[in-house]
Design a protein with these regions (language model features):
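Polybasic/polar functional segments that serve as interface/processing modules
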Residues: 1-129
């Protein structure tokens, strides 16, 4: 078994009505510089989002959430941010903002398998299948 290495992660939240501070966890971003890993898991739960704000444009939110995955992957079609280093992309994605899509505080831990960790965090925090 490989020795555990440090990682950082943050939860992606959709805050349909920013003034109410209600949110739905929609994804997780995991970054490990020691393992050269940056990836995200996103799941759009339309029913939960519409329960908070029936007028929400869920398809627009879904497009913005999928951009997070493309930026993590370094997809050139995702724009200039996707061309930054993995470290720069992670910290750009996790910067605080007051918008419909927000990010939790960054948390840290140890893992020898960041992909399995990402899958587990997505199941536990977002409820992905």
């Amino acid at each position: 078994m490989l020795a555990p290495k440090s990682f950082n992660y943050a939860t992606v939240r959709v805050v349909p009505r920013v003034e109410r501070d209600e949110f739905v966890n929609a994804g997780v971003i995991v970054y490990s510089s020691e393992q050269n890993f940056l990836d995200a898991r996103i799941e759009v739960n339309e029913a939960r989002l519409l329960a908070l704000w029936p007028a929400l444009d869920v398809s627009m939110v879904a497009r913005h959430l999928q951009a997070i995955c493309r930026i993590c992957a370094g997809d050139p079609a995702a724009g200039p941010i996707a061309r930054l280093s993995k470290k720069e992309r992670f910290y750009w994605l996790t910067a605080p903002r007051s918008a419909v899509i927000q990010i939790s505080p960054v948390r840290t831990g140890l893992s020898s398998d960041p992909k399995s960790l990402l899958d587990r965090l997505a199941r536990e925090l977002v409820g992905t299948g």
